[in-house]
């Protein structure tokens, strides 16, 4: 059902609304020499992007939701998270640049895979350190969510680019 996509929905909501906020902020910076006023197109962009971070649940809540659901699914065995954490701990840093395959986007693919391994290592260390109290460590969870958002967006862009190249 729809619950199967709750993690992805939370990641997309947070990432997209914060990217929109950053774009509006850059627009204000560009138009800053003329002074911020309602006469610029950035006024509505800024307002809309700020409101977007609040609607449909605040970004902070969605960050907690995404990581919380991921860890719960891992603990229940719905996702093979713990075996992936163990594997990540063993293989991280074992490949050399020379070991990367040739081909279009090979380096990008390698980089994204390393991002994933790094996330798994950090999540595993956090789980080991805090155990069941991890849900109380909001700063750790927010940092994990931020990493996960970047991985999700990077891999989505990578997969779309790879699909376009293969056409």
Residue ranges and their predicted role:
Residues 1-167:
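Alpha-helical interface subdomain recognition
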């Amino acid at each position: 059902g729809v619950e199967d996509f709750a993690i992805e929905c939370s990641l997309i909501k947070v990432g997209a609304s914060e990217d929109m906020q950053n774009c509006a902020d850059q627009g204000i910076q560009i138009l800053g020499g003329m002074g911020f006023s309602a006469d610029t197109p950035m006024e509505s962009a800024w307002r809309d992007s700020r409101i977007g971070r609040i609607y449909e649940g605040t970004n902070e809540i969605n960050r907690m939701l995404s990581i919380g659901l991921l860890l719960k699914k891992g603990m229940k065995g719905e996702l093979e998270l713990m075996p992936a954490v163990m594997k990540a701990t063993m293989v991280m840093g074992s490949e050399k640049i020379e070991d990367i395959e040739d081909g279009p986007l090979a380096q990008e693919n390698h980089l994204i895979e390393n991002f994933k391994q790094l996330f798994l290592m950090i999540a595993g260390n956090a789980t080991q350190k805090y155990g069941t109290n991890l849900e109380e460590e909001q700063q750790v969870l927010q940092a994990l969510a931020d990493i996960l958002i970047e991985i999700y967006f990077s891999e989505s862009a990578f997969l779309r680019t790879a699909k376009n190249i293969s056409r």
